[in-house]
Amino acid sequence: MKKFELPCTPAQWLEAVMNAIFFLCGILAVGCVAVITIYMFLSGLPAIGKIGPLKFLFGTEWASTASEPKYGILPFVLSSIYGTLGASLIGVPVGLLTAVFLSKAAAPGVRNVVVTAVELLSGIPSVVFGLLGMQVLVPAVAKVFGKASGACLLSAIVVLSIMILPSIVSVSVTALNAVPPEYEQGSLALGATDTETWFKISIPAARSGIAAGIVLGIGRAIGEAMAVMMVAGNSPNMPDSLFRSVTFLTTAIAKEMSYASGLQKQALFSIALVLFVFIMVINVLLNAVLKGGNKDEK
């Protein structure tokens, strides 16, 4: 057994103190996650028990302030899923192609301009995205498609697809820049074109980092509230059309929490628990993708 010895020099004391600080920071991070998890389950489970898991998760009607309240969150769940998937279908290809352009093809001057624009985009507050969407996008959707109102699922998808771009682009560029140049040089030496090399060599080699950026973008989309609340219409409808006014999980909480009480407030905590579980699942999938990518690379 290794004998314990007290630090005897200033450098050793400093090392011991820093190790203790690092350890405490790690414990603090884990503790915060544990406290949040416990609180969410303790706050969210009671209402699910009172309402009934099936009625709560698969009920199609939400009327929390009616004389006979109904607490079905299926419209919220589906709206969040459809909105996130729709934003991903737009944002992921655009973000990935932008990252390839910045990493492999852009001239230095152009790269600096685009990178600066992406960084500025990442710093814009959610409420600004929502305001622009409400003033520009919503009227445009109503006019182009001949609808009475443009506040709908489609508007939310477009806004979210723009909001997730910085996460996808930034992380993907970093991953692509980390690909060893020997991989691309070997491909070019064998007669492959630049485009073939980027899509068949560079992107597969950087897949774990790109996947991380995509999952971060998805997490941003599913957790967004303010911008979505300003453009989606906020009606608890089933999302059976892109032009339907809908409510997401996040906006349901933000819209009613200020005046909720009793079972209604407990139900909102249950919605937060469902959202929390979604985020946890996304993080688990991210770790699985990263571990799988690392094993393949080894």
How would you describe each model-predicted region?
Residues V94-G133, E297:
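Cytoplasmic-entry segments and transmembrane alpha-helices of multi-pass inner-membrane transporters
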Residues V228-F276:
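Interhelical loop and adjacent transmembrane-helix boundary motif
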Residues E15, V94, A107-N112, P180-P181, ...:
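Amphipathic cytosolic juxtamembrane alpha-helices at the membrane-cytosol interface
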